[in-house]
A protein has these predicted regions:
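Divalent metal-dependent hydrolysis catalytic cores, especially in the metallo-beta-lactamase
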Residues: 79-104, 110-132, 147-161, 183-197, ...
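Active-site gating loops and adjacent loop-to-helix segments of metal-dependent hydrolytic enzymes
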Residues: 67, 71-74, 79-94, 143-164, ...
Length: 388
């Protein structure tokens, strides 16, 4: 199948100007000022007045559903294909959260494969909040080495009343296993860390880094914008060389209580001197957004949305004045590099043909291509999930 996108203003994510993009099968075959070809079945798309950016990577999504903190009826539903594609997301990383009992690794991997059959790319992390880590094979290393979809471990919870209260030694052993498994499989072997509201912040990771040979970039902490004091701790952590991830799914009450809006968080991090390559956004899609009282009792619940991922990036551009090339990196090139997804995150020859076309006038999503296939056109789903 041949697709030719003509006259797009391309952000690779770096701005490279007006280009034609030729897609053959599932990859980008050429990017030139002008491509003029004829071939049977050639699909030509006029992207005049549109911006082409890499397909978005959402590396923290509860594809199986999450939640459950308010008992069984609060378990959230599985992700549907268009929950991702209508938001421009072409690559996902599935995680298990609080509930590592009824949400299992076999089910997580099966769901990832189902999403891939429907047209997008999906990886997973092994484990959940819990320590010891519940893996598929019995060992973190073995999951990474033997299971193609597994690229890291997590989300391991720290600084949270819902965590297993892991020690620095336990976290070090998890990171070591993930690192070795990653080395032997050619994967990132990253440890995705859920950071809660506790004033312990990122100290557990910092102790591991200070007392072992494990590098700070083995860890990928998320929810760093959840409150002002964690955000400030995140700035100091990032200045030591660590990655920081901001969660885009939110509700007004969280913002009123001090959560730092992602667009604002990005601007403040950059102003503080943190390199943009260390910063990512993820949606925490399909997670419950629980509100607890002072006694740790659940008093409210809403659902995280993958659609919020690009909405936050768009706000960073339109509301905070951040350059599109910098803003779009946090959901494209940065996660691709952190997770060692070498065929993702950039519009470049040889990369997977994951491309989003934006309206130049307002940065809204017009079209989405995943592995060369049109998933969204004119902001309408072209391909839907099996049960949608």
């Amino acid at each position: 199948m041949l697709t030719l996108i003509k006259n797009a203003d391309v952000y690779s994510p770096d701005h490279i100007g007006l280009k034609d993009i030729l897609i053959t099968d599932k990859r980008i075959a050429a990017i030139e000022d002008h491509i003029d070809i004829t071939a049977p079945g050639l699909h030509v798309i006029d992207a005049n007045g549109k911006i082409a950016v890499p397909g978005f990577i959402d590396s923290h999504v509860h594809i199986l559903g999450g939640g459950g903190e308010g008992s069984y009826r609060t378990r959230t539903p599985e992700l549907q294909l268009t929950d991702a594609t209508l938001g421009g997301v072409t690559t996902l990383v599935g995680v298990i959260g609080t509930d590592g009992t009824t949400r299992t690794m076999p089910a997580l991997i099966a769901k990832a494969r189902a999403l891939e059959e429907e047209g997008i790319t999906c990886y997973v992390h092994t484990g959940s909040y819990q320590v010891p880590v519940k893996t598929l094979t019995g060992k973190i290393e073995d999951d990474l080495i033997l299971i193609d979809r597994v690229i890291g471990a997590g989300e391991i919870a720290i600084s949270d009343h819902r965590s297993s209260q892991p020690t620095a030694q336990e976290l070090a052993k998890i990171a070591s296993a993930a690192r070795i498994g990653g080395m032997l499989s050619g994967k990132a072997g990253i440890v995705n860390i859920h950071v809660g509201d506790s004033h312990d912040h990122l100290s557990l990771i910092e102790v591991v880094v200070e007392t072992t040979d494990i590098p700070i970039k083995q860890f990928y902490p998320t929810h760093i914008n959840r409150n002002p004091h964690l955000f400030e701790a995140g700035i100091h952590y990032a200045k030591k060389g660590g990655y920081v991830d901001f969660t885009t799914s939110s509700i007004p009450k969280f913002l009123e209580e001090g959560e730092v809006k992602c667009s604002v968080a990005l601007k403040r991090m950059l102003e503080a001197g943190v390199d943009v390559s260390q910063i990512t956004f993820t949606s925490d899609g399909q997670a419950s957004l629980p509100d607890f009282n002072a006694d740790g009792e659940l008093i409210g619940l809403q659902l995280g949305k993958v659609m919020s991922l690009y909405e936050a990036v768009r706000e960073a551009v339109t509301d905070e004045g951040i350059d599109l090339a910098a803003a779009i990196r946090v959901i494209t090139k940065n996660p691709a590099q952190i997770l060692k997804l070498s065929s993702k995150g950039e519009i470049a020859v040889g990369k997977d043909a994951d491309i989003v076309l934006l309206q130049q006038s307002d940065f809204s999503i017009d079209s989405v291509f995943a592995m060369g296939q049109v998933m969204v056109g004119n902001n309408q789903a072209v391909i839907k999930g099996t049960f949608e």
